[in-house]
């Protein structure tokens, strides 16, 4: 039996040009996501070691041999958080993805991770962000662990630009896909599931990048 663990990453709101920010601007010291270095397809994904809402530490190296899916997440974003029917968590898209991934016959597990890097965006401490995430997790039934990236260092390392911004990493720790959760016009077209299936089949992931959409990300 395979097990799917989940971790969600909430990275603030920097976004594609089509989506406006819905939260208070971050301090002037914050850096816009567009200027950050980016993790590269076909190369090792940046290592991370982050704690979830229960204080448990999770490292990318813990999941060697497993396909890892990262979702950048923000509790106040209408596309990834708890506001409105367009949220991938409110409209059931994430649960549907996780359900479909349970049927992926792979040698290892599929690990779904949520990462929240919204401290600069929301002007809150890591502790306050954890509290808000815990309340929302319970309220809307988020199944995945939420990891707190309090200093936004992991968001910078990955070049996460929006919430949601998805990253799919294979069992060797190589980044195989990043970008949109699904097609903006056809929500049934899920690029993350396509990437996971391709990795399972030993195939090249195509496409390996689709422009992400959602709320924007800001860094400290």
List the predicted regions and their residue ranges.
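Bacterial N-terminal signal peptides
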Residues: 8-17
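Thiol-/selenol-based redox modules, centered on thioredoxin-like
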Residues: 168-220
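A short beta-strand-turn-helix
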Residues: 48-68
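Short active-site neighborhood of thiol/selenol oxidoreductases, capturing the structured segment around
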Residues: 61-87, 196
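Structural micro-motif
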Residues: 142-145, 160-167
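Structural microenvironment flanking redox-active thiols in thiol-disulfide oxidoreductases
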Residues: 81-139, 150-157
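Bacterial N-terminal signal peptides that target proteins for export
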Residues: 1-8
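N-proximal helix/coil linker or "cap" segments that precede and/or mark the start of modular domains
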Residues: 21-47
